Amino acid sequence: SFLADHAIFKCTNIGSSLKFCLLAEGKADVYPRFTRTMEWDTAAGDAVLRAAGGSTVTLDGTPLTYGKTGTAADFDFANPNFISWGGRKRVLEPA
């Protein structure tokens, strides 16, 4: 649904860190993630993206945070669904 609502025309199947790097480099526009990932899958790539001026937010628009604690087992390190983009674009609103 997100892809259709935002006129996404091409999808690339590569690892999370590479997706963040493509966003940071300006070679991709958006990285929506609606399935489970862990902090160690995304933290380094997200840091590169943010250093390049991009953003990663949860579906309610809150910046994605790392180092969460206080829940059971591996859930401490599970990411919520998120959307990342390069530059200062706003992508939570449909096109």
From Swiss-Prot:
<protein>
    <recommendedName>
        <fullName>Uncharacterized protein in pss 5'region</fullName>
    </recommendedName>
</protein>
<dbReference type="Pfam" id="PF00459">
    <property type="entry name" value="Inositol_P"/>
</dbReference>
<dbReference type="InterPro" id="IPR050725">
    <property type="entry name" value="CysQ/Inositol_MonoPase"/>
</dbReference>
<dbReference type="InterPro" id="IPR000760">
    <property type="entry name" value="Inositol_monophosphatase-like"/>
</dbReference>
<keyword id="KW-0536">Nodulation</keyword>
<dbReference type="GO" id="GO:0000103">
    <property type="term" value="P:sulfate assimilation"/>
</dbReference>
<comment type="similarity">
    <text>Belongs to the inositol monophosphatase superfamily.</text>
</comment>
<dbReference type="GO" id="GO:0008441">
    <property type="term" value="F:3'(2'),5'-bisphosphate nucleotidase activity"/>
</dbReference>
<dbReference type="InterPro" id="IPR020550">
    <property type="entry name" value="Inositol_monophosphatase_CS"/>
</dbReference>
<dbReference type="GO" id="GO:0000271">
    <property type="term" value="P:polysaccharide biosynthetic process"/>
</dbReference>
<dbReference type="GO" id="GO:0050427">
    <property type="term" value="P:3'-phosphoadenosine 5'-phosphosulfate metabolic process"/>
</dbReference>
<dbReference type="GO" id="GO:0046854">
    <property type="term" value="P:phosphatidylinositol phosphate biosynthetic process"/>
</dbReference>
<keyword id="KW-0270">Exopolysaccharide synthesis</keyword>
